[in-house]
Amino acid sequence: MLIHPNFDPVAIHLGPLAVRWYGLMYLVAFIAAIVVGRLRLRLPYVAAQGWTAKDIDDMLFYGVLGTILGGRLGYVLFYKASFYFAHPLDIFKVWEGGMSFHGGFLGVTLAMVLFAYQRKRSWLQVTDFVAPMVPTGLAAGRLGNFINGELWGRVTDPSAPWAMLFPGAAPDDAAWLAAHPQLAAQWHLNEVFAQYHMLPRHPSELYEIALEGVALFFVLFFFSRKPKPMGAISAVFLIGYGLARFTVEFAREPDDFLGLLAMGLSMGQWLSLPMILVGIGLLVWSYRRARREPAQAVSAS
């Protein structure tokens, strides 16, 4: 059984300024996106479409705005709408936390539509170019969550070699024991709690790094090395992320203010299902269009 390292959330102290790890991970995410994007410029079919390093820089500007605005508004609307409607000024307190990937995804999508309009490109051509740049950023964000010791997983069997004790979850663990006496007895969790005052949980942030970050990066990296029908790379991203997130949510602790929703699924799972379905539909449309219009259907990504 492992114990979370309980990192200091502040990475660097610069006089009165405190640079937090989570904020630093945003910087890492955008630097990684620049690196991956410039590597993609070396692909002959990408270069032939006229993409440049300046395009990447401009897209990231749009992407930063879409991520922050969409991520925050998505969290407000999807997760704590009643609270923020009652306390609207708290919406602007982003330093207190509260970002949603699905909201950020919608924000970035709208930002890329605007970028495509201004550059007179197809928006699917733009999202196909951007999609392989995203997983490294997702991994950085989840690493920030892990360093902060937040968004931990559900309680699990302490005999699992990956089971981890999260100090931040300790206030909820006594209530969990009272609510799940059978599992507590089966996994001998009362003894564990008596010794550590915490319960073992899935390190779900690390699962997300592995699936949404590493695995999805390599899937998109190899899939996009050669020309694909326009929309296909975006579709693979939607399907890949949706499946990864839907799967990890079974091990991730649901938000305490929402719990599990219909059919025993979490909010993250319900928001991921449309991504999977839209991705499948887009993939089918993409290849059917390529067969009908082979000369025009190849993506620039």
From Swiss-Prot:
HAMAP family: Lgt. The lineage of its organism: Bacteria, Pseudomonadati, Pseudomonadota, Betaproteobacteria, Burkholderiales. It holds the Pfam family LGT. The chain crosses the membrane at residues 17-37, 59-79, 97-117, 230-250, 265-285. It is an enzyme of class 2 (transferase). Belongs to the Lgt family. Catalyzes the transfer of the diacylglyceryl group from phosphatidylglycerol to the sulfhydryl group of the N-terminal cysteine of a prolipoprotein, the first step in the formation of mature lipoproteins. InterPro entries: Lgt. GO terms for biological process: lipoprotein biosynthetic process. One of its GO terms (molecular function) is phosphatidylglycerol-prolipoprotein diacylglyceryl transferase activity. It is a multi-pass membrane protein. Keywords: Cell inner membrane, Cell membrane, Membrane, Transferase, Transmembrane, Transmembrane helix. This is Phosphatidylglycerol--prolipoprotein diacylglyceryl transferase. It comes from the Bacteria. It comes from Paraburkholderia xenovorans (strain LB400). Its EC number is 2.5.1.145. It is found in: Cell inner membrane. Pathway: Protein modification; lipoprotein biosynthesis (diacylglyceryl transfer). A 1,2-diacyl-sn-glycero-3-phospho-(1'-sn-glycerol) binds at R142. GO terms for cellular component: plasma membrane. Its main location: membrane.
